[in-house]
Amino acid sequence: MKFSFFALKTMLIELSESQTRQQLDASSVFTALLEARAEAAVVRGSMIWREIDGRRYLIRTSTAGAQKSLGPESSETQTIAAKFFDRKERAAERLRQLTEQVVVMQRMNRALRVGRVPNVVVETLNALEKAGVAEHFLVVGTHALYAYESAAGVRIPDGAMATRDVDLFFDTRKGVKLFSSLGRLDSSMIALLQKVDKTFRVRHSSKYTAVNAAGFEVDIIRRVARDGDPHPLRMSDDEDDLWAAQVSSGDNILGARPFEE
């Protein structure tokens, strides 16, 4: 079904005062959750004391198993360790509380019919955020309209939003950073999607598409290769991973100011 801009404008449904208030509250809590995740990421891993040649050293360990000495035991390194564990504990508690609060907000959203983005889309974007790779992707196409209706406090007619796929535009200029991030996680794009829904599979006839058992598709698209862009482009070293499909509108998408809500 196609709609003209005028038709859409005349068919828009304004949210009620209670819906608008709930939408703002939910947005505020989710923003705080993203900040809490970032804070928790800074203090991932741990610190340990290790004896080397008769002296104790403070060692910073990462989740990947890397270790770095912060120096021999002293009042300074003891303070560093104490501050680290205090910060880690506070970050974990804040993350726990906000995660619980987001669940409450999701229930209220459903009760008031606010925040109607399909769950599979929300969970996919959350998976990218948790993996630290969300910054490399931009939602384009029909599902991007949800951000606009949220900002405007209106609802777009369901007929204009009916689609069974979401397009994720990948900025190839940030390719190295994405590949490094996935490498550190020992993961791939299809593996991230399978954390959302284990039935996601790469479609053999179109390697840029992942489809789940319900028929919902996630498409990875990119600009037409130029300026040394890698092509063809697989999203990770995994031979069974998704590939990015070139779209002629890619440069226009990159040149446009992204909308954030």
Which positions does each model-derived feature cover?
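Compositionally biased terminal segments of proteins
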Residues: 1-56, 62-64, 69-261
